[in-house]
């Protein structure tokens, strides 16, 4: 069981790397400061590994004991938490959507807490408030500063200054990757530390190594989404984006607070897009999909972990029956709504009657 828990955690760490690749280097790649995906992913891998080893220990304490009592987390619970979170994150990576590992990990831990009725609700509310406030602050800050740039017509056109901006942007991207290592590796190794499988030092070392590997092997599609599909931006705007994300996440990590780096960066990019194109940026399908995935994902990992605990550890078949019924009812309601809308469009276009 211990080996299975470690393998689950390392698999999850690889998926963290894939998601963090877009969050940290998507800006530099999208602005043209670094043109090849492979180089961007290598720089990301080095940054996240360094961040995990140097400063990844503080958030571990929050993940391991700040949401549910530490003694609740056994090896079996570790497998359930990591498995539920990894499945949610892996699905998002296949869709090419940048997703916060903090969301799915906390969601999985909450599912265990709900099953055993040992949830620290006040701490959870604080964490969720950070999930809302930090991306909104990033969005508002980048929108406001970008508007100032455009109002005062601040532009850098000389090739020499453009090269300097490119170097500064790469440095900012590296520090954003560093912040990802500080904040997100704890999501993979925190449950292992709580269960006593690894100490903090070994956990961050092994976790950091596999996060770096995941960035190299699985990060291409998410990198493309953040770098090319949401909006276009200059090197100066890229520095603003990466600097904002790195600063917010590093400060949060120092205080041991898990925050959604992927959402911070993506929200900053949307802020730039809105400053340039207005509210039309929200009409892009990729933005709408991202917002939906962000909302659904923590509830998905919560539901998976809750069901696994109820099925294999508590044999609480009544709760499982209720959850399955709710899911079937929700799916049926969604399907019915789509059918009604389709019928109304058909009547509007072709006229009524049978």
UniProtKB/Swiss-Prot annotation:
One of its GO terms (molecular function) is phosphate transmembrane transporter activity. It is a multi-pass membrane protein. The chain crosses the membrane at residues 3-23, 40-60, 77-97, 125-145, 164-184, 197-217, 293-313, 320-340. The keyword Cell membrane applies. Keywords: Cell membrane, Membrane, Sulfate transport, Transmembrane, Transmembrane helix, Transport. One of its GO terms (biological process) is phosphate ion transmembrane transport. Its main location: membrane. It comes from the Bacteria. Induction: Up-regulated by sulfur starvation and repressed by cysteine. Also induced by O-acetyl-L-serine (OAS), a direct precursor of cysteine, maybe via inactivation of a putative transcriptional repressor of the cysH operon whose activity is controlled by the intracellular levels of OAS. GO terms for cellular component: plasma membrane. It is found in: Cell membrane. Involved in the import of sulfate. This is Sulfate permease CysP. It comes from Bacillus subtilis (strain 168).
